[in-house]
Amino acid sequence: MLTIDGAASANAENLERIRPAMSKARDELQREIGVERLQRAREVGVLRVMLDVDPVFPELLELPEILQVVDHTLTDTAILHLQNGFILPPVEAMGYTVEEAREIFQFSFHRDFRRYLEGYLGCVNTLLNIDEFRESNGATVFVPGTHQLRKDPSRAYLEANAIPAEAPAGSMFVYDASVWHGSGLNTSGEDRLAVNHVFTRSYMKQQIDYVRALGSGFILSLPPRTQQLLGWYTRVVTSNDEYFQPPDKRLYRPNQG
């Protein structure tokens, strides 16, 4: 796991744009889905489709720090598997007991990429820390050396070797998505914000079909590299007419990895 300081503010102007945008995304999600439904799904504070809520979110995909990581690890044909916002409330405000919270996916030890590929890197995370990450406000805990393992470590091993990743606001964690990690519990009395990006090889299915979710008009309003990251050049054809197109008009462009 690598920590890069100052990444979140490099192209998003400043962190103060991101915080209200995340609050807006949370409000829109709660209106659409409802708080009770989110609690049943154990998704309180998780923001899944927010790219069209505020321009600051697609702008994050232009950050040089992120693009350099993606290009170096997965090549420039990689695509965005997900962009998730996290507004981690204090545990007492979540509507769960501490014991219940520890069983929620993001709080339990897990891997974001669960396949063992004999050392082949298929998926990379770039986690932007919008607020300072401290153990007291639920900093992500990592278990060093647990990426690319053929067999799962025991829970006792994970608990004994987990390290809270503390870092200042505006920093970015970069890590192999197969490393074991989990969110800590927030006991600070205040929300803790972060935005996670997971990137994969272009032939791996996205968590969200961003082209369908956002619409072609929105996608085409973005820079070409952002279009590519969102999957615009790796769409799946639905008819013979779409298949038999010249190379520059094909939904799945050549040389996409």
PLM segments and residue spans:
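A structural signal for short, well-ordered beta-strand segments
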Residues: 83-85, 126-128, 195-199
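Non-heme Fe(II)-dependent double-stranded beta-helix
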Residues: 2-110, 114-116
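Short, solvent-exposed loop/turn segments at secondary-structure junctions
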Residues: 8-10, 86-88, 133-135, 147-148, ...
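Conserved double-stranded beta-helix
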Residues: 149-150, 154-174, 178-179, 184-257
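Catalytic core of non-heme Fe(II) oxygenases with the double-stranded beta-helix
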Residues: 94-167, 204-214
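Residues that flank catalytic or metal-binding motifs in active/ligand-binding sites
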Residues: 53, 81-82, 122, 136-138, ...
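Short hydrophobic-aromatic micro-motifs
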Residues: 2, 128, 173-175
